[in-house]
UniProtKB/Swiss-Prot annotation:
One of its GO terms (cellular component) is cytosol. This is Response regulator protein GraR. It comes from Staphylococcus aureus (strain bovine RF122 / ET3-1). Phosphorylated by GraS. Phosphorylated by Stk1; phosphorylation increases the DNA-binding activity of GraR. SMART domains: REC (SM00448), Trans_reg_C (SM00862). Keywords: Activator, Antibiotic resistance, Cytoplasm, DNA-binding, Phosphoprotein, Repressor, Transcription, Transcription regulation, Two-component regulatory system, Virulence. Residues 2-115 form the Response regulatory domain. InterPro entries: CheY-like_superfamily, OmpR/PhoB-type_DNA-bd, Sig_transdc_resp-reg_C-effctor, Sig_transdc_resp-reg_receiver, WalR-like, WH-like_DNA-bd_sf.
Length: 224
């Protein structure tokens, strides 16, 4: 597994690199924190570990840049005790978030869970769903409508899959949150709202934002 570790604390970087390499992870770091995207594009990581507080530009800036060109899983690290950091990371499409200090074995477990969720599917099995006049590719986390294609985060795709498998039925927020926790995603009541809003924003790019309806006090419904 190729890991890009974007961490400016060299002591922490070396400690994490050593631990991760013992699990056969191939770890790359950043030499110039003004050119994170250069390393990202040349190394082509399978997962990015991204610190929030960095020199020159913060982790949120680099997450936006990565999301412009890739749907690679991103796990944020933060030493700040600020719940808004977690909300912001969700809004930007991160897959997980950990607050420093943390246990390295928990980080490794999260990385393995993300890898299983994103990459370990049977190559010849193409899982698709049809929704209205769009084709949803569950293995690629993409939605194609006509000539347009959008890409979702894993959390957004799980939410959408839950809703469209129960089309025209109200799905409670608790049901969605429970399913996401079962899938090892990190979602609270507040961040579920963030994810649904972000999902709608992406659907608006293919004129489908009205296909998911909020049922106040009850949950959400995907229309046929």
């Amino acid at each position: 597994m190729q890991i890009l570790l974007v961490e400016d604390d060299n002591t922490l970087f070396q400690e994490l690199k050593k631990e991760l390499e013992q699990w056969d992870f191939n770890v790359a770091g950043i030499e110039d924190f003004g050119k994170v995207m250069d390393t990202f594009e040349s190394f082509n990581p399978e997962i990015v570990i991204l610190d929030v507080q960095l020199p020159k530009y913060d982790g949120f800036y680099w997450c936006r840049k990565m999301r412009e060109v890739s749907n690679v899983p991103i796990l944020f690290l933060s030493s700040r005790d600020n719940p808004m950091d977690q909300v912001m990371s969700m809004e930007l499409g991160a897959d997980d978030y950990m607050q420093k200090p943390f246990y390295t074995n928990v980080l490794i477990a999260k990385l393995q869970a993300i890898y299983r969720r994103v990459y370990e599917f049977t190559a010849e099995e193409k899982r698709t769903l049809t929704w209205q006049d769009a084709i949803i590719d569950l293995s690629k986390d993409s939605i194609q409508k006509g000539d347009d294609t959008i890409f979702l985060s894993k959390t957004e795709m799980i939410i959408l899959e839950i809703l469209i498998t129960k089309k025209n039925q109200i799905v409670s927020r608790d049901t969605i949150i429970t399913a996401l926790w079962d899938d090892e995603a990190f979602v609270s009541d507040n961040t579920l709202t963030v994810n649904v809003n972000r999902l709608r924003k992406k659907l608006s790019e293919i004129s489908m934002d009205s296909a998911i309806e909020t049922k106040v006090g009850k949950g959400y419904m995907a229309h046929e």
